[in-house]
Amino acid sequence: MRSSLLATAMLICLASTAHGQKAQPKTERRNVAVEVFQVLGLPVNVHEAVLLPKDGGYLLRCRMSNESSSEISGLRYVLTSIDVVGGTQLIANRTEGFGLPGYGTKSLTFVTPIKFNPKEGNRFVLMVEQVLSAEAIWEVIKAKDTLEAYVKGDYSIQPNVMRVTNLVDAPTQIRVIY
């Protein structure tokens, strides 16, 4: 009697466990961690980058800090996938606009979805290529070559940054006529 009661209890436990496993969705999308390749010459540092699932794509969320006195109005970034086998694939190359005050920090979620299917075991690397402010533009020289070297494990190549005056978005100078 006791052994049949124990067998019945175990059968019920196994059946409920099997039923619970079938109820879970098979294609559950999760947040994807992103490694950030920091470029030291840029006035923006990116931290805590993650891809959030949303409507068939992913949104990039990150925390940014501004190391300059001028307000940052946008940036251009590259998101690359590193396959387990060693191949790389460009996922996104985007320009995003936002407002980040001088010496400020902000958490941002870029609302333009990135459409791709992440594979299990892939690494994702984010690199900022260009930073825009009203006074200046910071551009990484040979950003593609630097990112390719970083992805292959060659950390000896450091990116060079060129800073130029922003003549398009620069505020107009006040002229005093005597």
Q: For each of these PLM feature ranges, what is it?
A:
Residues 70-74, 89, 172-174:
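Short acidic/proline- and small/hydrophobic-mixed sequence motifs that coincide with surface turns
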Residues 66-71, 85, 168:
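Short, acidic/polar linear motifs in exposed loop/turn regions
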Residues 81-91:
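Short aromatic-acidic-glycine turn motif
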Residues 113-173:
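Terminal connector regions
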Residues 89-118:
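Intrinsically disordered, low-complexity Pro/Gly/Ser/Thr-rich segments with frequent PxxP/GP/PP motifs
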Residues 4-14:
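Sec-dependent N-terminal signal peptides
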Residues 17-20:
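Sec/Tat signal peptide C-region and signal peptidase I cleavage site
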Residues 23-61, 146-177:
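Low-complexity, acidic Ser/Thr/Pro/Gly-rich terminal tails and inter-domain linkers that flank the onset
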